[in-house]
A protein has these predicted regions:
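Non-heme di-metal
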Residues: 1-180
Length: 180
């Protein structure tokens, strides 16, 4: 009886983790698209617009993947998507208004947190298609971070403070999207 209860608890725990992972990844990719959308609006004539568009296109592919997983696994999306839209576009616009370096500092901070978040998920997921895909997406997110650093993200005024602020916001969004 005890063993059966433990097995049921493990199944519930695994199922709950899977649902939270899909929900939060769906929300995160949506938020990233919104950030890039805000940056594109301001930096449309900038020398880094090509990179921003390419990174946004990858985020759209990630989002579509998790959107399919939401449907396939019957996972409830976070109710916070409208909030993430407003905050994401606003963050993209605000950092882009402060200049290319600040926009790239935003990208570097966000992608670093997402890379760590995906790494943690990969460690907890069983082998399979979802784990492989999240691992691939993690590599792509870290490429975005590296592109941002190559474009002098760390040269942004107040980089350390800005980066810490954005990383904290991302971690809060991850936490809330898992639950709500």
């Amino acid at each position: 009886m005890e063993r059966e209860r433990n097995l049921n608890n493990l199944r519930y725990s695994s199922s709950k983790f899977l649902q939270q992972a899909i929900r939060v990844n769906h929300a995160g990719e949506y938020g990233a698209i919104c950030i890039y959308s805000g940056q594109k609006f301001i930096l449309k004539k900038s020398s880094i617009i090509k990179e921003i568009i390419e990174m946004e296109e990858q985020e759209k592919k990630h989002f579509h993947y998790f959107n399919e997983k939401i449907k396939e696994q019957k996972v409830r999306p976070t109710v916070l998507l409208p909030v993430w839209r407003v905050l994401g576009v606003s963050l993209g616009v605000a950092t882009a208004i402060m200049g290319r370096k600040t926009a790239m500092a935003c990208t570097a901070a966000v992608e670093e947190v997402i890379g760590e978040h995906y790494k943690e998920q990969v460690l907890h997921l069983e082998d399979g298609e979802l784990r492989e895909t999240i691992s691939k997406f993690r590599d792509e997110e870290l490429e975005h971070r590296d592109i941002a650093i190559e474009h002098n993200a760390e040269g942004a005024f107040g980089y350390n403070i800005l980066s810490s602020f954005i990383k904290t916001g991302c971690k809060a969004a991850i936490y809330l999207s898992k639950l709500i």
